[in-house]
Amino acid sequence: MSKNQSVSASEDEKEILNNNAEGHKPQRLFDQEPDLTEEALTKFENLDDCIYANKRIGTFKNNDFMECDCYEEFSDGVNHACDEDSDCINRLTLIECVNDLCSSCGNDCQNQRFQKKQYAPIAIFKTKHKGYGVRAEQDIEANQFIYEYKGEVIEEMEFRDRLIDYDQRHFKHFYFMMLQNGEFIDATIKGSLARFCNHSCSPNAYVNKWVVKDKLRMGIFAQRKILKGEEITFDYNVDRYGAQAQKCYCEEPNCIGFLGGKTQTDAASLLPQNIADALGVTVSMEKKWLKLKKLSGEPIIKNENENINIEFLQSLEVQPIDSPVDVTKIMSVLLQQDNKIIASKLLKRLFTIDDDSLRHQAIKLHGYTCFSKMLKLFITEQPQVDGKGNETEEDDIKFIKGILDFLLELPKTTRNGIESSQIDNVVKTLPAKFPFLKPNCDELLEKWSKFETYKRITKKDINVAASKMIDLRRVRLPPGWEIIHENGRPLYYNAEQKTKLHYPPSGSSKVFSSRSNTQVNSPSSSGIPKTPGALDSKKHKLSDEEYERKKQKRLEYERIALERAKQEELESLKQKLKLENERKSVLEDIIAEANKQKELQKEEAKKLVEAKEAKRLKRKTVSQSQRLEHNWNKFFASFVPNLIKKNPQSKQFDHENIKQCAKDIVKILTTKELKKDSSRAPPDDLTKGKRHKVKEFINSYMDKIILKKKQKKALALSSASTRMSSPPPSTSS
């Protein structure tokens, strides 16, 4: 053991003696008891992580991950960002940082205790009356994470079924913990070593719920410093559920005698520790209320669903807020709260703030995200129910208006938080349901519309500017100030004062000491380059003349540095503009070429369409001419053969000759009609005049055929007669 540890142990022993002198029971140490951890692990299934009944269960109601505003701080290969001594807003509001989601604090920061399973060293031992117990193997500091309470995360119906089942199976111990409304952790069969933590009416630990990624997880934390060998206990009456009340063996002076069950007695905690702290409730306030209830003879009933005493909660007067610590406690509970009664009590306390520094603290601790969630909670169709079971929708409306008024009072900041929380969208939906709130909503939205949005400083920005500026990770700014990024350079910005500075504002704390032993106020350790006017290691008094000369030299150096920075920024902007113009020119050429190709394609397509149309019209014209010719042929063929047969001279021809004559006559008549008018169709009915003309044409045609036939016959006879009258040719002897 080191010297410091010896001193610490001595101080702890003094504290125990003092407590004993004041009437408190001295802390018992069990470090001599055998370590039965291995034996205890055989009594249940040890889980690496909780088992969820479905994907939806155990999920934190706010789906958007909330980043902290810390910056990574590596030393000896370890990222010390977001540690116990930091102002990490995630740590303060019970949210763990997640690798690759927190953009500025870097990976593997110190706010990942659940994810990395950074448990305190503990051991299991056998107690006299309580079965197994958990003891500290080393001293545990106040608020240190001890262990995660793991098990099967189930819904309320399954929880009630298991209560009955375990009771019927005569289980001696119960291991249910409420995770959130309607959801429970059951560590009876599957869990972690934390299930063996026993109850005490004067506990040294407490249970708290943390948001890890998108899930709520439950951890056990030290309420005060716990000595090595001391048993680790918490108050079951607040945090744990069981079917039947059981005898308590904690042996504390204030022991109430029983734990579990539905009825609370004299020393029972009426509220979970974190809610009591957020409301400013002290142990003396609880005892006073319990005493009054006992004197009146009334039973003290806790809420079956949430294990809190609604009657006590409703009786509380609003406690004033005195410090940023109070704001932190309230905001950490509000972010996880979906109980309207608890939320309304916390909001009433928050509404009493009349100091801008405290309002800034509320904004800093994911304020806009929290108020967005609260508005949604009170907008829901389900009205608030008071301690007597009465629905009070008017109270819901009152709190919605109260939140709007509080938001209106908040000092001006950047618009980043409003946009990331989407609270403006929630406010825009209110007038549709509550028209009388439209003026309040419009006024608030008008105020927010004037806020400016800035890029946040990122890890990359810090690395680039590291040699030219103060290490931003170690600068603590006054309320209302934040670090933004503008034109590639970090600035200190106060939206309320409309002020931007290149260096930390007055009122900010000095640069925090780094983890090395460098001098914090020296220019080199703070990240500011040494100037000719920097302090020498050996200080000596300067004459007025020498002081003025050094001052002028320093001012000249700063002026030159400022001019150089301006020139560099101007050159950078010119280069960016040149590159932008070149890219624009190339883009315009590409667009022009694309348009040209598009026009050519359009022309080709147009020509193709015109050619197709011309071809179609030609086909249509030919087709129409052929159709008319066919119709005229059909028209004449309907009566020409009959007229030929009736002609007296037709008897001189056989059937085939008459058929051929009919075809020829029809073709001749059709040709004549089309020559007269190529677009005229044949009439539907044959007129007498037309019939007469066709008949005359047929008679004329037949006469010509007969005449030709006779002439041909006569010519043939004449030729034959000539051959017969000619003397035969002479033959030679």
Swiss-Prot record:
Residues 120-237 form the SET domain. Residues 244-260 form the Post-SET domain. The modification Phosphoserine is found at S10, S522. Residues 506-528 have a biased composition (Polar residues). GO terms for biological process: ascospore formation; DNA-templated transcription elongation; DNA-templated transcription termination; methylation; negative regulation of antisense RNA transcription; negative regulation of reciprocal meiotic recombination; regulation of DNA-templated DNA replication initiation; regulation of DNA-templated transcription. GO terms for molecular function: histone H3K36 methyltransferase activity; histone H3K36 trimethyltransferase activity; RNA binding. Pfam families: AWS, SET, SRI, WW_1. It is an enzyme of class 2 (transferase). Its EC number is 2.1.1.359. It catalyses: L-lysyl(36)-[histone H3] + 3 S-adenosyl-L-methionine = N(6),N(6),N(6)-trimethyl-L-lysyl(36)-[histone H3] + 3 S-adenosyl-L-homocysteine + 3 H(+). SMART domains: AWS, PostSET, SET, WW. One of its GO terms (cellular component) is cytosol. Keywords: Chromosome, Coiled coil, Methyltransferase, Nucleus, Phosphoprotein, Repressor, S-adenosyl-L-methionine, Transcription, Transcription regulation, Transferase. Residues 548-630 form a coiled coil. Residues 475-507 form the WW domain. Residues 1-32, 504-548, 672-692 are annotated as: Disordered. Residues 619-718 are annotated as: Binding to RNA polymerase II CTD. It is found in: Nucleus; Chromosome. It comes from the Eukaryota. The AWS and SET domains are necessary for transcription repression. Interacts with the RNA polymerase II hyperphosphorylated CTD. Interacts with CYC8. Belongs to the class V-like SAM-binding methyltransferase superfamily. Histone-lysine methyltransferase family. SET2 subfamily. Present with 217 molecules/cell in log phase SD medium. This is Histone-lysine N-methyltransferase, H3 lysine-36 specific.
